[in-house]
């Protein structure tokens, strides 16, 4: 602690002792009948409200006692404690009272701390209360944060009691929003009916009073988006819909319209936010070239493709700003969290002593940003995957005595935090391999391995082995080998099987024979532990990176997003998107010359809302 800080702390401690002993106190604040002896100078130093009160020439300047109306005594006591000691013990029970008192006394620093506390501790049980509290107080930033939170988590908010305690006009305004993150309109109808039935306390006539607002609230529900069976079931379960003529008419008209042609699309209604989410192919970690816009830079945006609609969109690249210099691997967890790994950019690397594997996650709620999760001991040519709450770094090359050697090391990290921990190693050293998550297990295949376990051998042998990791036993098992030894292939899980596409390889075990670019598709069935041939690719192709996939599965179909044709000239990407329908067993080109960059690092599939992504540039410049 420096001398200046120590001096200030000593002064506060002495003033606080004098306040407790009522020495040299020159004013007594009274709130709710409780008296608080204080020093005018201290009050004026922390509160512009008191400074004006004690210097404006009015009677408070000379009065010994000042009564503060509409000021809770517990909140005032805590604010005085903060003035004299800097201690401010915020809790869920006292934070709103303290923030109101700080707002009235113009103590902006305390008010800001209260807002930060409420934002940090916001959840589905209190966000509605915080929103209306902040709106009534005029705290716009807090109100905006709370409103975004409750809209994003509206499905969970509906399960709580806060939403049932709203006034009719408040609920109606909330249900009018297009921005509610609900996947089905049935949940909106359900919360309306629960609100009508809700009777707080022992108020027997409350349900009748609430039923008067039912026609008005039903008009906020987008009934054409509700299934006809659900509409009929709701009418059977809720007599309030039957006894009110207007409600009955609204429901019968909705059922009749839906029954006329159940296959017809609903009449034009704007979908709510959560209804627009869709599975997207994300080509993450792009290079800068390939897309030029006159006014907007797409260098730091990554290409996305929506197979169901054919739309092209762009997501912020993890290379944006000073994040990752390049992306080496990525995975989408079972909870739809987009995680990538790689190295820091040059500017950040200059400020760090050690080079590490850096892990970043896409922040969907703060769209356009990536947040740092963890750092692991450096390796390259590894695979990244996830099971449950854990990330896994598998194999690759690690530094040993100033040289990089292929390793069998596997490390695990919990998304809840903590250190990286070693787990069961691979049965052999492996690099440039592929990993697939399926049915709660990890499958590692292909890649390159040393000729023997001697660390000075060249890593010039490709692998055709398939390894399975069981997290319950923490063991690796070797399964049936592939027909081809290979690397630079893509591997995905589809319909309970593993599809391995293309790559560079040779037939059988690699003993140094000729290698060539493959158009082969191999399919593994885990139930019978056997491989079968799949429909060959239209031409031999390679992934864009040595160990990262360029394929993904959406709605039961397999997609390949950009690739290199053949091994001779793989410096130019073919920007086509291939599709395989496993039932038809035929490859088709669904997008030619897609608006993607000249290269990217890894293809992932995630469920995202197009509203949070960028559209293609309207001012595209031909290169």
UniProtKB/Swiss-Prot annotation:
One of its GO terms (cellular component) is cytoplasm. One of its GO terms (molecular function) is ubiquitin-like ligase-substrate adaptor activity. Residues 25-92 form the BTB domain. It holds the Pfam family BACK. PROSITE patterns: BTB (PS50097). The keyword Repeat applies. Residues 127-236 form the BACK domain. SUPFAM superfamilies: Kelch motif, POZ domain. Kelch repeats lie at residues 390-440, 441-496, 498-551, 557-607. The keyword Transcription regulation does not apply. One of its GO terms (biological process) is proteasome-mediated ubiquitin-dependent protein catabolic process. This is Kelch repeat and BTB domain-containing protein 12. It comes from Danio rerio (Zebrafish). The gene is kbtbd12.
């Amino acid at each position: 602690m420096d001398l200046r800080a120590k001096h200030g702390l000593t002064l506060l401690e002495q003033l606080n002792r004098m306040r407790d002993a009522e020495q040299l106190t020159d004013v007594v604040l009274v709130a709710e009948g409780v008296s608080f002896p204080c020093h005018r100078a201290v009050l004026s130093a922390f509160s512009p409200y008191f400074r004006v009160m004690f210097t404006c020439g009015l009677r408070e300047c000379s009065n010994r006692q000042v009564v503060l109306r509409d000021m809770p005594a517990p909140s005032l006591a805590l604010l005085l404690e903060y003035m004299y000691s800097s201690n401010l013990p915020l809790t869920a029970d006292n934070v709103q009272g303290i923030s109101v008192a700080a707002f009235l006394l113009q103590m902006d620093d305390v008010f800001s701390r209260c807002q930060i506390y409420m934002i940090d501790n916001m959840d589905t049980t209190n966000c509605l209360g915080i929103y209306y509290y902040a709106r009534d107080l005029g705290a716009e930033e807090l109100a905006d944060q709370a409103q975004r939170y409750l809209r994003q988590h509206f499905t969970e908010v509906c399960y709580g009691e806060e939403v049932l305690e709203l006034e009719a006009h408040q609920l109606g305004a909330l249900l009018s929003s297009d921005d509610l993150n609900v996947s089905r309109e049935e949940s909106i109808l359900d919360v309306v009916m629960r609100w009508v039935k809700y009777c707080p306390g022992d108020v027997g006539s409350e349900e009748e009073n609430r039923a008067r607002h039912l026609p008005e609230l039903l008009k906020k529900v987008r009934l054409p988006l509700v299934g006809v069976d659900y509409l009929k079931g709701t009418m059977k379960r809720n007599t309030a819909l039957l006894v009110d003529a207007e409600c009955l008419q609204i429901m019968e008209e909705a059922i009749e319209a839906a029954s006329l042609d159940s296959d017809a699309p609903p009449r034009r209604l704007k979908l709510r936010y959560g209804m627009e989410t869709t599975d997207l192919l994300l080509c993450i970690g792009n290079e800068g070239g390939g897309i030029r816009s006159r006014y907007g830079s797409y260098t730091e945006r990554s290409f996305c493709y929506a197979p169901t609609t054919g739309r092209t969109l762009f997501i912020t690249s993890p290379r944006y700003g000073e994040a990752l210099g390049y992306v080496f691997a990525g995975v989408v967890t079972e909870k739809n969290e987009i995680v990538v790994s790689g190295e820091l950019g040059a500017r950040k690397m200059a400020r760090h002593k050690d080079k590490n594997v850096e892990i970043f996650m896409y922040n969907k709620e703060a769209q356009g940003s990536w947040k740092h999760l963890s750092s692991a001991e450096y390796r390259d040519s590894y695979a990244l995957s996830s099971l449950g709450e854990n990330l896994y770094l598998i194999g690759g090359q690690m530094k040993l005595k100033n040289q990089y050697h292929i390793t069998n090391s596997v490390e695990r990290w919990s998304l809840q935090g903590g250190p990286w921990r070693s787990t069961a190693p691979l049965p052999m050293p492996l690099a440039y391999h592929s990993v697939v998550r399926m049915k709660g297990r990890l499958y590692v295949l292909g890649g390159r391995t040393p000729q023997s376990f001697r660390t000075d051998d060249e890593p010039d042998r490709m692998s055709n082995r398939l390894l399975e990791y069981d997290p319950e036993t923490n063991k690796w098992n070797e399964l049936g080998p592939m027909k081809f030894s290979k690397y630079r292939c893509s591997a995905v899980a589809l319909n309970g099987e593993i599809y391995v596409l293309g790559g560079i390889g040779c037939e059988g075990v690699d003993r140094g024979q000729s290698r060539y670019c493959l158009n082969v598709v191999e399919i593994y069935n885990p139930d019978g532990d056997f491989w079968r041939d799949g429909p060959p690719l239209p031409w031999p192709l390679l992934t864009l990176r040595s160990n990262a996939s360029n394929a993904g599965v959406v709605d039961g179909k397999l997609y390949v997003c950009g690739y290199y044709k053949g091994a001779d000239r793989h410096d130019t990407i073919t920007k086509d998107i291939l599709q395989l329908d496993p039932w038809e067993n035929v490859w088709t080109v669904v997008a030619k010359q897609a608006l993607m960059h000249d290269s990217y690092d890894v293809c992932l599939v995630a469920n995202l809302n197009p509203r949070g992504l960028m559209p293609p540039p309207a001012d595209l410049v031909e290169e």
